[in-house]
Amino acid sequence: SALGALIAGGISEVSVGSFPNIGIITTGDELISFDQKQIKLHQSYDSNGLMLKAAASKIGLEKIDIARTKDDMSEISKEFREMKKWADIILVVGGISLGERDYVKEALTKGGVNEIFWRVRIKPGKPLYYGSYGENCQVFGLPGNSVSAFVCFHLFVLPAILMRAGASEES
């Protein structure tokens, strides 16, 4: 339908961008795969990775990989090192607040991420982190709470994806 509108308007050429490659790292000792049938009281299903992948896929992104780590500095750092080799945008979910086992901010700093901001004045979503790695990689630290992660994705990550794909700030 969009192609028909362009042709009807006499437009024969359009500029298009490409969608970025997205890496998602979910963190948490409590996380287990959704296909595990036995769940203990201290565990929860790793729903954030799949939720964010589905949201990114819905707008047309194709290269989206998910990794899961424990609340462990070396595991988080290892996954980040792997993803920064190919990803244009990296989402690290959980472990970004002020808890005793929240290592994401420190791991990102040690991994060479330039922090642009940490914490925003919204609820849900307060512990949001944003930084950059190198020339072209954007890094978001999203809260582990699913509703907070969803809100932060739509308010902050989605606009970043669309702008990288060529959308204007106004749209």
Language-model-derived ranges and their functions:
Residues 13-18, 58, 82-85, 121-122, ...:
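Solvent-exposed alpha-helices and their adjacent loops that cap or buttress functional pockets
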Residues 2-4, 34-38, 78, 102-105, ...:
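Short acidic, glycine/serine/threonine-rich loops at helix termini
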